[in-house]
Amino acid sequence: MDAGAQFGVAPGLNEAVLMAAQERHLPFFPGIMTPTEVDRALNLGWKHLKFFPAEPAGGVAMLQALAAPFAHTGVQFIPTGSITAATLADYLALPQVAAVGGSWMAGRKLVAEKAWSKITALTAEALKIVARTQNKTGRTKKFHPAG
């Protein structure tokens, strides 16, 4: 926060980090991959969770199976991890997905090569996928980190 962060994201569920974020009123998204971790996060008061690593963990099918028993809680997921333009729409179509993260648009190699036009093109493609998905599902993702 001292450096200007408006929210935080982690790959795992670390209770000390969650409590520090809570003390500073920092919107924070702990990482989960199992039902036990979802249950633990919910018991600690967190309803916006990073599903990581999404694709290696089983992708959309795994997230649907993981989310189903918790549907009554209002939990929302932010899948990240090996997601690409080819899988973006599948995640966005899920009602329990608040947002999707992906590094394919600005990967380390592209940044190191200063491939700004490629990064811009990949980001524009992702935004088109988002718009098409919203038009198809009739839903927009109105997600605000603070709640």
Predicted regions located by residue number:
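Glycine-rich phosphate-binding active-site loops on the catalytic face of alpha/beta enzymes
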Residues: 11-17, 50-59, 96-118
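Generic hydrophobic/aromatic pocket-lining and core-packing "Φ" positions
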Residues: 18, 38, 63, 88-89, ...
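Short helix-capping segments at alpha-helix termini
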Residues: 70-73, 133
